[in-house]
Amino acid sequence: MAGYLRAVSSLCRASGSARTWAPAALTVPSWPEQPRRHYAEKRIKVEKPVVEMDGDEMTRIIWQFIKEKLILPHVDVQLKYFDLGLPNRDQTNDQVTIDSALATQKYSVAVKCATITPDEARVEEFKLKKMWKSPNGTIRNILGGTVFREPIICKNIPRLVPGWTKPITIGRHAHGDQYKATDFVVDRAGTFKLVFTPKDGSSAKEWEVYNFPAGGVGMGMYNTDESISGFAHSCFQYSIQKKWPLYLSTKNTILKAYDGRFKDIFQEIFDKHYKTDFDKNKIWYEHRLIDDMVAQVLKSSGGFVWACKNYDGDVQSDILAQGFGSLGLMTSVLVCPDGKTIEAEAAHGTVTRHYREHQKGRPTSTNPIASIFAWTRGLEHRGKLDGNQDLIRFAQTLEKVCVQTVESGAMTKDLAGCIHGLSNVKLNEHFLNTTDFLDTIKSNLDRALGKQ
């Protein structure tokens, strides 16, 4: 199974035993130089490196094409390469994931290919040492920040919500709540209590949650002021960057203390740090109840940032993706509270079903656009940090080429299915296979850049 992976042991540090992450103790490893490639001399020079995180399965194959055919022929950039493919994560005891996050902290920009988060079946398939955690979760825990998902709009791809004529960016607070909760099943009558024991030695506080007359379920969850504050800063900075209004949705009428804390921290930070900039850009910030917000989103035309708690963001981001047409047309960017560190990736997974077909030697029609946008969003941000207008223009041109290619009628099967219905589409009449579609984008990009 690991045969599809390139040998990259020289690029990633191997670790003989599992290691615990401690920021003060770990340093970013040194990398050998990438092998020299022979490209045209008139490439855009990028002064500072970009961290590249490779991935798994079909997206890994597409990722290589994007890098070698669309990016590097036009951009002279040093890539700090990390192989986050599952076999290498297993070989390094997941140290490679930690190292990639620390490198992102150092260089401020990372682009990431989709990766496998193993379950029991994957542990058996890859003969893993253990069921490794989600690499995205590991990276987010080190970097902090907020995951922003935004649709890529193509005029000819029908939207389930036709009124959404402008993008809606959803900012998910990817920390705590249900995803770090302790939940349990009780099988008899008893009392469920929550206890908080202060570190300063003062008296413990106790809350009685429920007296169970019989079996049931319970849960305790948390979040922190520090994490909520980082979430708020990321959202306000992103809104200013996009020049779009920001809405925070909670259910503070029910969770008066828990969700109320989100509402209060956002308002305090807005008033203290961002109100002037929002007024200058003629945008606004509002808190809305989640049920009211969902209704308003459906009635809106788009053009705003929606800040969601962890679970809400998980659910609503998929609703937005389908509402705009396809998960294959959805970008995902992790923005850190410092306002300069980001990690860009596709919002979808590794496309396992297509990879199984690829293993059998059969052609697939896999949509690469979200993976291309991972590169463009990362490079555009690198350009903004470095003041490199040529790099910014290149990234924006490649994005426009992708959209214009689809709007011209050249697309993959998933997008053709949105127009004609999957049961009605035919190869080369309604859609192209993966390679032909990527070749079409390459030709259109070369033409747009005046390379032909």
From Swiss-Prot:
Question: What's the name of its gene?
Answer: Idh2
Entry comment on modification after translation = Acetylation at Lys-413 dramatically reduces catalytic activity. Deacetylated by SIRT3.
Q: What is its main location?
A: mitochondrion
The molecular function terms of the Gene Ontology recorded here are: isocitrate dehydrogenase (NADP+) activity; magnesium ion binding; NAD binding
Q: Transit peptide, first to last residue?
A: 1-39
- Chain positions with N6-acetyllysine modification: 45, 48, 67, 69, 80, 106, 155, 166, 180, 193, 199, 256, 263, 272, 275, 280, 282, 384, 400, 413, 442
This protein is called what?
Isocitrate dehydrogenase [NADP], mitochondrial
- UniProt function note: Plays a role in intermediary metabolism and energy production. It may tightly associate or interact with the pyruvate dehydrogenase complex.
Q: Where is this site: Critical for catalysis?
A: 179, 251
**Positions bound to Mn(2+):** 291, 314
Catalytic activities? D-threo-isocitrate + NADP(+) = 2-oxoglutarate + CO2 + NADPH
Chain positions recorded as NADP(+) binding sites: 115-117, 122, 299, 349-354, 367
Which compartments does it reside in?
Answer: Mitochondrion
What family does the Swiss-Prot or TrEMBL record give for this protein? Answer: Belongs to the isocitrate and isopropylmalate dehydrogenases family.
> What is the native source organism of this protein?
Mus musculus (Mouse)
Class of the enzyme per the UniProt entry, highest EC level: oxidoreductase
Picking any one GO biological process from the record gives: isocitrate metabolic process
Name positions with the PTM N6-succinyllysine: 80, 106, 166, 180, 193, 256, 282, 384
Per the entry, which co-factors are needed?
Mg(2+); Mn(2+)
Subunit details = Homodimer.
**Which key words tag this protein in UniProt?**
Acetylation, Glyoxylate bypass, Magnesium, Manganese, Metal-binding, Mitochondrion, NADP, Oxidoreductase, Stress response, Transit peptide, Tricarboxylic acid cycle
SMART domains registered for this protein in UniProt: Iso_dh (SM01329)
Induction / repression: By oxidative stress (at protein level).
